[in-house]
């Protein structure tokens, strides 16, 4: 099954690599239109996944990741249209020149080929990845979680029908719909056809791919994100940033998980924060100084464990740690962070610069919410993943991250001397 799927994807990638930008944009436009026209059918299939999730006792955070609404579907269609508006990186000349030998040489962006994406309970990823791969001339094999089987099946049907309407091979976008986990292992070994594996999910999925794949793997997505409130920060504004970073959509990987507060302002700042978040159902996890302050402020708080400081909650749980100064904050991030997104709230330009220079993360923020680490927010269009590694791509992966390059050398029957 996967051998045939891989060959079909490779053949489709050969065709996609030769398409003009206009041809690719035409297909994307049809996909966006079909997402809207087929919305009732898509939402009906998604409702089946939601009902099964509830029956199986999945968490509210996971169900939120599964859920498609009319508004979310419209947003997904808009993301596809935004990808249409973005510059096509394929064929772009990165650099070049003429050598002493007379050979003209250029480095030109090219598609990667075939992308394999393994993801968990996020049906929106199906469209995000498909649209970015199509724009960059890549074929894609998708493997969603069993929790999204109905949603993914209908979304793939919509995309493949749109491809055929555009006169393109439907096998440019394929999905493994069988929930058998052995097929994941087979996909990870399909290096004859697949050029890159991109996992989107928890740490367990990323570890599985790293350990078993014979194909290069993009690692990332696990976000134990921190925000450090330094003593010079505007406390009232800081509270709104923390509210946004924690409560806007807690299930995402760019959500704040651990709040670091400088010791000298903790007794003043934390009660204000608790009061502001009183209606948001935030559960705090803290120890020593922070634990005592939060208890006195009437917060729903329990003692934090070492394991929880490394945990991506994906919920309204929030770790709170009081630190002595910026050095202690940076050291805490070095010990517990996942190199995803880290933020400092401060009025000091010098301390902001120190934080930027010393914190090792894909995205570092000054006086802003970590929720901005997103392909759409960064102007990249729908992202295929957020990479926390340093090779090939880092941070939100947009169009350029799905390309490689080739050296194009032109001579006049030139030979090497």
UniProtKB/Swiss-Prot annotation:
Subcellular location: Cytoplasm
Top EC group: oxidoreductase
Any one of the GO BP annotations: L-proline biosynthetic process
Keywords: Amino-acid biosynthesis, Cytoplasm, NADP, Oxidoreductase, Proline biosynthesis
Any Gene Ontology CC annotation: cytoplasm
InterPro entries: Ald_DH/histidinol_DH, Ald_DH_C, Ald_DH_N, Aldehyde_DH_dom, G-glutamylP_reductase_CS, Glu-5-SA_DH, GPR_dom
EC numbers: 1.2.1.41
Catalytic activity: L-glutamate 5-semialdehyde + phosphate + NADP(+) = L-glutamyl 5-phosphate + NADPH + H(+)
Biochemical pathway: Amino-acid biosynthesis; L-proline biosynthesis; L-glutamate 5-semialdehyde from L-glutamate: step 2/2
Keyword NADP listed: yes
An example Gene Ontology molecular-function term: glutamate-5-semialdehyde dehydrogenase activity
Protein family membership: Belongs to the gamma-glutamyl phosphate reductase family.
Function recorded in the entry: Catalyzes the NADPH-dependent reduction of L-glutamate 5-phosphate into L-glutamate 5-semialdehyde and phosphate. The product spontaneously undergoes cyclization to form 1-pyrroline-5-carboxylate.
HAMAP family according to UniProt: ProA (MF_00412)
Protein name according to UniProt: Gamma-glutamyl phosphate reductase
